[in-house]
Amino acid sequence: MARRRKGDDIHGWVILDKPLDMTSTQAVSAVRRIYNAKKAGHAGTLDPLASGILPIALGEATKTVPFAVEGSKIYRFTIKWGERTTTLDREGEVVATSDVRPTPEEVAAVLPDFTGEIQQIPPAFSAIKVDGERAYDLARSGEDVQLEARPVQIISLQLLDCPDADMAVLEMRCGKGAYVRSMARDIAHALGTEGHVAALRRIRVGGFVEAESTRLDELEEMAHKGAASEALLPVQTALDDIPALAITEEESFQLKLGRSIVLLPRQAQELKAQRRPREIAGKDCTFTALALCDGVAVALGDARAGKFQPSRVFNLTP
């Protein structure tokens, strides 16, 4: 019996515009099938009831997922006033109601209280583990799940529209770990009412933006025409804010063997000039950098004391 083919060596990022009613896992499987890729993963789960940006990594790009996940995210969402549900979105059962309908002015007035570093209690229906079990599994079994508040960073929060008295459309830019559903609940409570997320769309993840995204049906059509590669972004796309180091073929060879390379004074200065503000403010002189040979990612590593030590090597060819 012939061995089943494992897939092709496809490397890069596909910025999928995930449709509603599809899990992130299903989306990854669909993209992996289209490209017949050996390996695939995604940068940040998007619930079935949400649409929008789902960056999908293929092949060697999966090694950069941790960096993509750390980037800020932008969500556009609609709060429906007057009803809180078990899941804090339109899928759950209504558990609390209110006749209070805030005005646009009242909504805008409370938003500054929810920016910066705030304490947020995650939804009971979330993937957070409680004593080794997922919170949503416990909640579905009928248990009263009590999660502790944790710090999250809300970079910006603004009111976009109030189409009617029952709805408000907002946009939030946040750091890792923030929940839109919790934000909707907390804003509603601050306004003396109840609320849940009626619609949710993610429009940015780190450096990945909506304009670069491709719908699944478009991707399938491109694949049918033999043009799926047009939607594939380079592996290093998720590493745009990391200092880049141009190296020679010989240096590339050494790094792929796991050996460090010596930085020329010029290279060291160029890397330092590219450092991010938080790295400059830190006391440690070590910082992460990306080595590139002819524009192709070779390795991620630590630059320190005139040397570059690889920590993660990419198996890519020019």
From Swiss-Prot:
Biological process, per Gene Ontology: mRNA pseudouridine synthesis; tRNA pseudouridine synthesis
Catalysed reactions listed for this entry: uridine(55) in tRNA = pseudouridine(55) in tRNA
Active site positions, chain numbering: 47
Pfam families from the UniProt entry: TruB_C_2, TruB_N
Domain of life: Bacteria
E.C. number(s) listed in UniProt: 5.4.99.25
Gene Ontology molecular-function annotations: RNA binding; tRNA pseudouridine(55) synthase activity
Class of enzymatic activity (EC top level): isomerase
Assigned keywords, A-Z: Isomerase, tRNA processing
Keyword tRNA processing: yes
Signal sequence coordinates: none
SUPFAM superfamilies: Pseudouridine synthase
InterPro entries in the record: PsdUridine_synth_cat_dom_sf (IPR020103), PsdUridine_synth_N (IPR002501), tRNA_psdUridine_synth_TruB (IPR014780), TruB_C (IPR032819)
PANTHER family: PSEUDOURIDYLATE SYNTHASE TRUB1, TRNA-PSEUDOURIDINE SYNTHASE
Role noted for this protein: Responsible for synthesis of pseudouridine from uracil-55 in the psi GC loop of transfer RNAs.
Family: Belongs to the pseudouridine synthase TruB family. Type 1 subfamily.
HAMAP family: TruB_bact
Protein name, entry field: tRNA pseudouridine synthase B
Organismal lineage: Bacteria, Pseudomonadati, Pseudomonadota, Alphaproteobacteria, Maricaulales
